[in-house]
Amino acid sequence: ESGVYTGFIYCADPNGWGNEFKFQKVAGDWGTEINSGHMTGGITGDFADGGGNFKATAGEGVYYVTLDMANMTLDAVKVEKMGIIGDFNGWGGDVDMTWNATDYCFEATNAGVTAGGWKFRVNADWAINLGGETLDDLVANGANIGVAGSTVKLYPTRKTSDKIYCTVE
């Protein structure tokens, strides 16, 4: 209720509503909504006040959101680039991933990740990165991933699971 919540959301505008949205404290219960009017501490980054709704000012895409209920602030960073970096490429430069809007995942083929360790990072920067000891529970600033493979899919939005996870084939 008064904590800091972080996560990825996918904003699309299939109905022409201008990429506007609200959060719900309880799924399906609009009486528990959190909207832009509640953010007395401000809205920063790639979101703005959309007249009661949050508005994704950078348009359709995936965003990393930090919602601070204690200070009533919201910050959002648009994921312009999701990348994979690690031992397999000497930790130098990202393997770019593409967004698959049908499956709600970022994917890369021929990534060539190795068991030597690797991570996901947003916008070629370490400020937002994901790792983990298991593929089915990735976290911010988590441990290096130690699974080898070619095709990597990252599911960040929690649409298909309560956790952020990836698959490696």
Describe each model-derived feature in a short phrase.
Residues 1-169:
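Insoluble glucan recognition modules
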